[in-house]
Amino acid sequence: MRIAELTALLHLASPALPIGAFSYSQGLEAAIEAQLITDADSAREWIASGLTDVLARGELPFLAHQMERWRTHDAESLRVANSEFLASRESAELRRETEQMGWSLRQLCVSLEWGDADRRATLASMTPLAQPTAFAFAAYAHDAAVDATLAAYAFSWVENQAAAALKAVPLGQLAGQRIIVALREPIDAAVTRALATSPDNINTFAPQLGILSARHESQYSRLFRS
């Protein structure tokens, strides 16, 4: 891997990227409220399940195929796939989350003039924009490999989930680091599975997550926006 590619992916996966990822828990806070998560072990199991049963089957293969569509600049397919991803969000919170993060990442891409002008124009015209579509553009604009991009995206997701668990369970810093370390190998497996998934086999079916996310919208006390 080239150093420029590595640093670009580190940038995109960084918690310092100003797209608001820190403000979302993607159902984890609702799982804590429902007492599905009570300690470090149950937090690790929940996050691992999200990685292998949700991300690996849905978001990661979607990201991979969107990168290919950016490469060929198939604008119509990009828009259709983006709309399908938005429609797959099972609650208002999850829909707003991906739209807000997609909008913020697009602002960054356009302001920093990443990629070529024609593709940036296509990106700017897509409203609302799903966050993985914007992430795929940013990774393509930096000539990042698909497998490395998926690994960076998955690691960023795991890290954000662990950070949410630290605040909401709550857990100690060492417990959070143990969760991240435990999920490094599963990230590898998730990427491998995602790369082997065709567009027709992308699956976003996660009823428990959808129900918990919907409940979170009216949860009395909460730290996160999802």
From Swiss-Prot:
InterPro entries: UreF, UreF_sf. This is Urease accessory protein UreF. Pfam families: UreF. Required for maturation of urease via the functional incorporation of the urease nickel metallocenter. Belongs to the UreF family. Keywords: Chaperone, Cytoplasm, Nickel insertion. One of its GO terms (molecular function) is nickel cation binding. It comes from the Bacteria. One of its GO terms (cellular component) is cytoplasm. UreD, UreF and UreG form a complex that acts as a GTP-hydrolysis-dependent molecular chaperone, activating the urease apoprotein by helping to assemble the nickel containing metallocenter of UreC. The UreE protein probably delivers the nickel. It is found in: Cytoplasm.
